[in-house]
């Protein structure tokens, strides 16, 4: 199962308390399984069937580029973080 992490800001926004192990072969199924554990969490993570604008998904240290279709391995570490902007 993948380990899913949120930063402090996301924990407060979602009520998510820390790290959780969930099954899933891609981000879409990981989020669906998170929704079973934490009803309503998909409203913070998903917008129009993709990752919420302003949110980044990091899988095993790599920033995802294809949204909910990103592959997740059995032992992956998944982080949902607010996207960083710069100028």
Regions of interest found by a model, annotated:
Residues 1-86:
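Ubiquitin-like/PB1-type beta-grasp interaction modules and other compact soluble beta-rich domains
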């Amino acid at each position: 199962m993948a380990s899913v992490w949120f930063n402090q800001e996301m924990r407060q926004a979602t009520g998510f308390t820390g790290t959780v192990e969930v099954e899933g072969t891609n981000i879409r199924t990981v989020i669906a399984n998170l929704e079973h554990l934490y009803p309503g969490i998909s409203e913070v993570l998903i917008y129009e069937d993709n990752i919420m604008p302003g949110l980044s998904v990091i899988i095993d240290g790599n920033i995802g580029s294809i949204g909910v279709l990103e592959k997740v391995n059995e032992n992956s570490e998944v982080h949902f973080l607010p996207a960083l902007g710069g100028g």
